[in-house]
Amino acid sequence: MIKSELVQRIADRNPHLYLRDVEKIVNAILDEITNALSRGDRVELRGFGAFSVKHRDARVGRNPRTGAHVSVDEKVVPFFKTGKEMRERLNNGVDD
């Protein structure tokens, strides 16, 4: 599912909301999560999961096509850990 499909599904389930308002809400939520992560904060949505950032050290990698060694710079990457309720729902089937 892509963002536009998510917006459409939320709008379909909430006919009292305009599609453009749902899109603004979804964008605002994603912007706030992104801003928090860029500050190094952790974002926890109980039952869903937690977004955080992890530091990856510089390392020597390998080009899969040529086999040549390449230097990979250190970087910060986003990380998501699922919550207990989400793991249980995924393992017990999905409700629509």
Swiss-Prot record:
It comes from the Bacteria. PANTHER family: DNA-BINDING PROTEIN HU, INTEGRATION HOST FACTOR SUBUNIT BETA. The keyword Amino-acid biosynthesis does not apply. GO terms for cellular component: chromosome; cytosol. GO terms for molecular function: DNA binding; structural constituent of chromatin. One of its GO terms (biological process) is regulation of DNA-templated transcription. This is Integration host factor subunit beta. Keywords: DNA recombination, DNA-binding, Transcription, Transcription regulation, Translation regulation. The keyword Nucleus does not apply. Coiled coil: none annotated. CDD domains: IHF_B. PROSITE patterns: HISTONE_LIKE. Heterodimer of an alpha and a beta chain. It comes from Methylocella silvestris (strain DSM 15510 / CIP 108128 / LMG 27833 / NCIMB 13906 / BL2). This protein is one of the two subunits of integration host factor, a specific DNA-binding protein that functions in genetic recombination as well as in transcriptional and translational control. Belongs to the bacterial histone-like protein family.
